[in-house]
């Protein structure tokens, strides 16, 4: 990714991501990178606006996670501290970059608690998060490097695939739009979703969704929910289109953004529903 098209915040977020992954080295097999940094692995081609994110999101697979060493202790030793907000799974670096540790909601027994109890690890180590279920199956190892020339580190970690990221972004946007916390709705998530659909063949994402759902029935509820919500966003004015237009404001005409969201999402959904492949 060209250095001139990367924001300073993203450079710092990648540096802190590598710090966290190094601290959690013994647990790397149970970690999957999700969120914007995963999106940019698959969709490095952007626009005149610098690639931007301020944090790092990691999904934990409880089936693969070892009980030792303690994640909280490892992060603390590396200079991270629990977020003062008290949000479970939110860890803050010395320079204020947040690393979120999340366990897919469907990978744990049902509970009303946000905390994700993990044997051998503190109660606030991670939190349950809906929408990440597919990332435990749709991922591949990627060698991540720093975005600064003087930092020569490389850490190989599993990165969620485009299908998993589309579902995660859709569920995140839906929950924030329909929830009581409208202040947490950001246009960037819709922009990231559109970026994925533009950089990765939309039909191939749809086929991957269908195949993953068939191979791993446990993800069917969340995939179905995301697909149904996306389908309902493609006619008339909708929160998804409004957010995507807002994200591209000043860069791209609203009509062009609207057409791109509708056409690319429809192509993905049609491929997903094409039983004959």
Label each PLM-derived region with a short phrase.
Residues 1-277:
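Compositionally biased terminal segments of proteins
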């Amino acid at each position: 990714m060209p250095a001139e098209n990367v924001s300073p915040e993203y450079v710092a977020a990648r540096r802190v991501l590598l710090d966290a992954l190094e601290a959690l080295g013994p647990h790397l097999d149970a970690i999957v990178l999700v969120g914007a940094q995963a999106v940019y692995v698959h969709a490095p081609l952007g626009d005149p606006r610098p690639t931007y994110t301020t944090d790092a999101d990691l999904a934990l697979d409880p089936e693969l996670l070892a009980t030792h060493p303690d994640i909280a202790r490892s992060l603390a030793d590396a200079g991270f501290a629990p977020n003062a907000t008290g949000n479970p799974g939110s860890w803050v670096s010395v320079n204020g970059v947040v690393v979120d540790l999340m366990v897919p909601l469907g990978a744990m027994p049902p509970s009303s608690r946000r905390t994700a109890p993990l044997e051998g690890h503190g109660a606030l180590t991670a939190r349950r998060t809906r929408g990440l279920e597919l990332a435990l199956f749709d991922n591949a190892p990627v060698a991540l490097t720093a975005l600064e020339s003087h930092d020569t580190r490389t850490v190989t970690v599993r990165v969620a695939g485009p299908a998993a990221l589309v579902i995660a972004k859709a569920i995140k946007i839906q929950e924030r739009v329909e929830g009581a916390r409208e202040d947490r709705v950001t246009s960037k998530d819709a922009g990231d979703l559109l970026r994925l659909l533009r950089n990765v063949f939309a039909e191939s994402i749809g086929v991957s969704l269908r195949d993953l759902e068939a191979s791993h029935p446990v993800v069917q509820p969340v995939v179905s929910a995301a697909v149904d919500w996306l389908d309902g966003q493609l006619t008339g004015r909708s929160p998804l289109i409004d957010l995507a237009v807002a994200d591209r404001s000043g860069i791209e005409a609203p009509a062009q953004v609207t057409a791109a969201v509708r056409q690319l999402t429809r192509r993905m959904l049609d491929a997903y529903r094409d039983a004959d492949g």
